[in-house]
Amino acid sequence: MAQQLAREQGITLRGSAEIVAEFFSFGINSILYQRGIYPSETFTRVQKYGLTLLTTTDPELIKYLNNVVEQLKEWLYKCSVQKLVVVISNIESGEVLERWQFDIECDKTAKEEGVRREKSQKAIQDEIRSVIRQITATVTFLPLLEVSCSFDLLIYTDKDLVVPEKWEESGPQFITNCEEVRLRSFTTTIHKVNSMVAYKTPVND
């Protein structure tokens, strides 16, 4: 029985990819809600990681995010994705106002068949909960977005990766005159995700 429990708690590369992709699904939803990119009434409450989180009910956005997360899961499994960035821009001017960057490290030795890492789901979820809580708390220091904004998702992958047709190449979309705040990280022992947010420094009149 003890051996079986240890096996169940072991993290595989596939399992790790699913955990990290799921985090991005909830994390992106949290950012879009907290920053008011979509109307608050288009979100619904769900329980995850011991928290009450908000996820979109917008059909087009659900379809888009599901496609991104499924593709991301495959790239995480191949250890070929380096970072995911949520870019928030002024719709009218195109100016980048915020850049949420998640750097992804992958232990490629986990690609070997049968490799499992010892870390409990609970320990991983506790770390993810801390990251999500920080995302929620950023509204206390991020400048108010007083203009209509849109968002883009950038995914940095290995150069030799075959990218689906619907995906476009993009520049890094950096911010001029910005402040950066490093957020917490979490690790499955196979994938490690480091988080930070950069935002345009408000100009004092």
From Swiss-Prot:
GO terms for molecular function: protein homodimerization activity. Keywords: Acetylation, Cell cycle, Cell division, Centromere, Chromosome, Cytoplasm, Cytoskeleton, Kinetochore, Mitosis, Nucleus, Phosphoprotein. The modification Phosphoserine is found at S130, S170, S185, S195. It comes from the Eukaryota. InterPro entries: HORMA_dom, HORMA_dom_sf, Mad2-like. Residues 195-205 are annotated as: Required for assuming the closed conformation and for interaction with CDC20. GO terms for biological process: cell division; establishment of centrosome localization; establishment of mitotic spindle orientation; mitotic sister chromatid segregation; mitotic spindle assembly checkpoint signaling; negative regulation of mitotic cell cycle; negative regulation of mitotic metaphase/anaphase transition; negative regulation of protein catabolic process. Residues 14-197 form the HORMA domain. Phosphorylated on multiple serine residues. The level of phosphorylation varies during the cell cycle and is highest during mitosis. Phosphorylation abolishes interaction with MAD1L1 and reduces interaction with CDC20. Phosphorylated by NEK2. GO terms for cellular component: chromosome; chromosome, centromeric region; cytoplasm; cytosol; kinetochore; mitotic checkpoint complex; mitotic spindle; mitotic spindle assembly checkpoint MAD1-MAD2 complex. It holds the Pfam family HORMA. It is found in: Nucleus; Chromosome, Centromere, Kinetochore; Cytoplasm; Cytoplasm, Cytoskeleton, Spindle pole. The modification N-acetylalanine is found at A2. Monomer and homodimer. Heterodimerizes with MAD2L1 in order to form a tetrameric MAD1L1-MAD2L1 core complex. In the closed and open conformation, interacts with MAD1L1. Formation of a heterotetrameric core complex containing two molecules each of MAD1L1 and of MAD2L1 promotes binding of another molecule of MAD2L1 to each MAD2L1, resulting in a heterohexamer. Interacts with MAD2L1BP. Interacts with ADAM17/TACE. Interacts with CDC20. Dimeric MAD2L1 in the closed conformation interacts with CDC20. Monomeric MAD2L1 in the open conformation does not interact with CDC20. Component of the spindle-assembly checkpoint that prevents the onset of anaphase until all chromosomes are properly aligned at the metaphase plate. In the closed conformation (C-MAD2) forms a heterotetrameric complex with MAD1L1 at unattached kinetochores during prometaphase, and recruits an open conformation of MAD2L1 (O-MAD2) which then promotes the conversion of O-MAD2 to C-MAD2. Belongs to the MAD2 family. The protein has two highly different native conformations, an inactive open conformation that cannot bind CDC20 and that predominates in cytosolic monomers, and an active closed conformation. The protein in the closed conformation preferentially dimerizes with another molecule in the open conformation, but can also form a dimer with a molecule in the closed conformation. This is Mitotic spindle assembly checkpoint protein MAD2A. It comes from Mus musculus.
